[in-house]
Amino acid sequence: MEVKESFTPIYSSIKRCRVCGYQFTKESKVCPRCGSKDIDDARTRIENLRRLAYETGNVIIGTDPDSEGEKISWDIKNLLGDSVNIKRAEFHEVTPKAIKEALMNLREIDENLVKAQIVRRIEDRWIGFSLSQKLWEVFKTKNLSAGRVQTPVLGWIIDGERKFKEKRPVTLIPELELEVDGKISDKPEIYVKVELIGEKEGSISPPPPYTTDEMLKDAARILRLPVKDTMKLAQDLFESGLITYHRTDSTYVSDRGIKIAKEFLGADFKGRKWGKVGAHECIRPTKPWDRYTLQKMIYSDVLYIEGITEKHLSLYNLIFNRFMASQCKDIRIKIKNYRIKFDSKILNDERIVSAEGRAFELFGNVKVKRELPLGEFKTSVKIVKKPLGYPLSQADVIRNMKEKGLGRPSTYSTIVEKLFLRKYIVERKSWLFSTNLGRKVWKFLTENFPDFVSEERTRILFEKMDRVERGEISFEDVLREVYIETKEVIKKVPSVS
């Protein structure tokens, strides 16, 4: 609601039909979809919370430690009223130590985090709903949606398909583990001369602990887990007190994390903070228990955790090994530099031929190649047609979102899920492909509303939301900009080509 150049959100309780599952906010005792009167209204739970709060007079809210959690805390505070003393407890792991520390350091609700989340929610409603209505009008169905992040992501997937269809010639030399652009010979075998021109020993740092995007990427690549499944498993692990909060873009390691790594690694421990202290920490285990120790404790009833499956343990193992590797001494490597001559070409090939150390054993992120035979000899070659690029995986999409500044750790998975839900994309062998509907929707939006769904404009808006979080700019100024944009979308008459 706009009131004298300011904006006031209007809230209503969420209702859900127990018969058909339809969710709505309209004040009605009848389901708008199926007509059933069997309705679950959140107002009942709100009234129960109010009654409990008034009985005690004091309430501590411990929702998730991010802007969404802060907004939920703020909502609860407003619903309970001023007659109750309300404080916020923030903890990043569900362990007795972390919860005790949170209770000893209660704070007020961070209004800037709340304002930033309000901007995100309202922007999503205004722009997303306005664009979606245009889709409904043109495509004659309400099972479609659009949004600032959703549309560019769909475009990346379409572009990945395009590159996959375009081919280029490549020469493979299997014996040398080499791939050379172009066609270097018409014959199945060529003479090559390999010389060793240098070798050295060195060291490289292990990778940092997981952030949300990196966890999702590796879970898809290594465990073949869809993004949605990974986030659900991580939520379970967090709620079971086994890992820290899993929606984070920070690699920072707390003193508690350092202590856990030191206890597990012993002589292999080096210890790294991986950044400055901030509101969030990396994703890490809360105890110095590897997968097998944890599994043994659960199966022998030493530790009772309900519902832990093999998938939970596999994801835990990935998080544990990555974190412990990040706290190890550097990986020792041996590098060899070769000069390879064939026909009129000369190639220099520098490769890691060995890697050692606990970090490499825990998380082998270093690609090791075999040493090459020296001298002049004949070797086989194979000319193949390779694509200019490959279709994106779910992990690729999330990495792009992180790199391009679109979306946040809490929204990475939901964006991908929505594209599946709307039937804009399908997945084949871990690759994402657009459907005919997805391509039509993307073409319509980019041709008629290019400014509203462009990567650059979306990135700038997200930067402004971050500035609202830091208290640098007014959230109402940002909302005013979005409101003007929304009116432009509403009045535009789209064309269909």
Give the label of every model feature segment.
Residues M1-R121, S130, V384-L388, Q394:
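Intrinsically disordered, low-complexity regulatory segments
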Residues M1-S12, R18-G21, R51, T141-E239, ...:
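Long, highly charged, low-complexity internal segments
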Residues T63-P65, S83-K87, R107-V114, F164-K167, ...:
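Short, polar/flexible loop-turn hinges at active-site or ligand-entry regions and domain interfaces
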Residues V119-R120, K140-T151, I173-E179, D236, ...:
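A glycine-rich phosphate-binding loop feature that marks nucleotide/adenosyl-phosphate handling sites
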Residues R120-L131, G202-E214, K232-I243, R272-R291, ...:
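Core structural elements
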Residues T244-G266, T414-P450:
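Accessory beta->alpha helical hairpin/"wing" motif in late/C-terminal subdomains of nucleic-acid enzymes
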Residues K270-W289, F452-P494:
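Leucine-rich, amphipathic alpha-helical/linker segments
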Residues I346-F363, S393, F420-K423, E427-T446, ...:
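Substrate/cofactor-recognition hotspot
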